[in-house]
Amino acid sequence: MIFTRGARITGAVLCAALAAVTAAWIVRDLLETERPVDLWWFWAGQGEIRAASPPVTSLLDPVLLAVHTVVALTVMRSAVAASALFAAGALTLAVRLPGLWVLGSSWMDGRAPDDLRTRALLCSFGVLAAAVVLIVTALAGRGVPDSAYALTPTRPAQGVAVTAFLLLGAAAGIWAAWEVYWGQRLGLDAYLDRVTGESVLMPLLGTPPGWLNAAIVLLCLAAAVGALFGTPFSRPLGMVAAALLTGLGGAALATALRYEQLDRFGELTTVEQLSLASLLFGLGAGTLALFALARRGEADMPGAGAHGPAWGRPEPQRYGQGGGGFGPPPPSSPPPGW
């Protein structure tokens, strides 16, 4: 099966629109802050920010901007365009879905002007609708190849698949372990607040940490299992999950360098040490997985299955062609006297 041209155009337009919306919110925050670098440290979770109006974006917005931009630019000629659109839609749903209840909740009263909250809520509805259309387009936009040169989905190479499985599988295990830890430490009620965002100070378009970590676990786990079985969707989905890990790990590394946490690593508490080590592992694993999965995939050979050539009756030999068995091929013309 191939991905039709109409579906590719639809996906490219939707991704471009999503990238434009995210870029507009980022530009809005940059214009409201005194210094652009202050917005970066706000994204990294380093305290308050001097701004005429509270920031709306979070660290996930530049990640979304990068994903939507890359997919919009490559979907027209990519062999895994359908999987890329599905992965972009899934990431957008995972990040923006909490806005439906966070922006209209009572605990957000007083954190931002009502008109700003209304604009953010309407924007969230539009973005979620576009994400759903992306997923539907990815699932319904397949067609039958019209030529032997049509772009068909490719699978990750064996070495790439093993690398992605190990890195993303380990990241999923680490992030899941942290959520188990916080669930036991906080108790059920407080942990549910961590998932819904009720007890968390975050920007209007932010994602509750418990919800975000659960999304990272699911994305990494799905990509890791898909890579293990060599499925075409594992490459785009793995790159999306790796982009999340790289973004979070990059912010953690910047914070650690700013406050010299690496130099005084031994002075940190055990939880702080493990948290920093986990985020730095996510940075390394995400970067390596991105580079590995960005390599061109392998196309399926015609008539070949997972364990070699397909079973069945061999094609009859034609005179003048090489044979498939032992011995020399038949001569191109009969010898004299035949």
Provide a role label for each language-model segment.
Residues W25-V63, L97-C123, A177-A215, A251-L279:
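Membrane interfacial helix motifs at helix-loop boundaries and amphipathic/re-entrant anchors
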Residues R111-I135, A161-L168, G266-F291:
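Alpha-helical membrane-associated segments of multi-pass integral membrane proteins
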Residues M1-T10, H68-A88, V132-T163, L218-A241, ...:
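Cytoplasmic membrane-interface segments at the C-terminal ends of transmembrane helices
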Residues L14-R28, L91-R96, F125-V133, Q158-Q184, ...:
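Alpha-helical transmembrane segments of multi-pass integral membrane proteins
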